[in-house]
């Protein structure tokens, strides 16, 4: 048997490997390989007896073996009707494998050693991410009383005091001013001057000590003068009782004056008796004047008539005025009660978030007015890393749920086929919840009825999905095998980004979204969502 040409053997084998690689991307390549293989086998069967055709028979056998494998793969893919592509979980072959095949074996061994070292580094990264998650959970407990107070103020359960309402910006900078006031104004003394000043201070202290005994005799003299003053006080006390008889004499003189006062009172009473007859005469004159006034008609009597008529007209106008007053009171708007808490707080916050604002439709706003709080909870130690957003709603006429949840699961294990695992947080999966809508209140769907060919309207209208913020709680599921549709993939990517924004900024700094400060151009340029994948 003649030896086979190595070129003729390797070329069909290479074609078979290439056909196997192309079979995963298209079914047509498999069909073409089937046709080529069948033609090659028929040609080989027709030429069979000559010794010179041994090389061609060996080459046809090798090509038939390669084509048989490709035909089997092609038929299997054609039956499945869907080519399994790379997904978020599917392991994909790295493009650097072809480069590794070109390297010498010794270099490949060393590169594999570096890969093993990198795997150990990825394990350290997982510990680092878990430690960050534990720190977040720890400090979330410290923030919990602050979040509770925020909830009470928003929902009018607590009214802040005047001190809590004051802006403490001046206190923040008071520390610098105090530090400046404490600084000495004079220059510190030099080394030689310090010794001279210390000597001067010692001499001054000695002089003060010498002056102290000279002051002691002066104190003794003052003590001797003190008993003299006490003796003088005693002599003054003795002189006080001598004044007693003089006071008694003055009292007797005052008693002698009282009879004169009584005499004056008696004279006044007699004068009153003498004046009484004159008063009687005056009274008689007054009565006569009144009689003459009544008999003679006066000119003042004529203008008094219209005054009396005006008095009669007053009660006629009063009922009309009262009616007008009542009408005016009805027309006036009633005084509105002052707002309680902070109305529409979370609705305003979510509308100012970049990715969530466009999702909120007009039909969503009346529902989101019942949103009382948004909180963040972290997974317990020992569980897979995840965090859950809790949306608390007040009782409302739209759905029966008081709590809507959205959970994001973080990838915490290294992926050998992802060289950028150490870049930070990456959301692996998200889960929503089911909303128990009341009848006719579901804003996530709408009904449409189209006329049939006959012109009649459909009895059962179609249910069509509707754009709404509450689609946020029903994200598309990630398949274990295969890949998502492009539209679903885009929705999921945006959902992951929203979860990152809520986690990093919205829950912690919601007040800046409410006031709109977060949309200021100064802050917009330096925004970072915490994940380099979504860095802007």
UniProtKB/Swiss-Prot annotation:
GO MF annotation, one: histone binding
Keywords tagged on the record: Nucleus
Q: Which SUPFAM superfamilies match?
A: NAP-like (SSF143113)
Q: Where is this region: Disordered?
A: 1-104, 160-338
Q: Which domain of life is it from?
A: Eukaryota
Keyword Transferase set for record: no
**Record protein name field:** Nucleosome assembly protein 1-like 3
Origin organism is Rattus norvegicus (Rat)
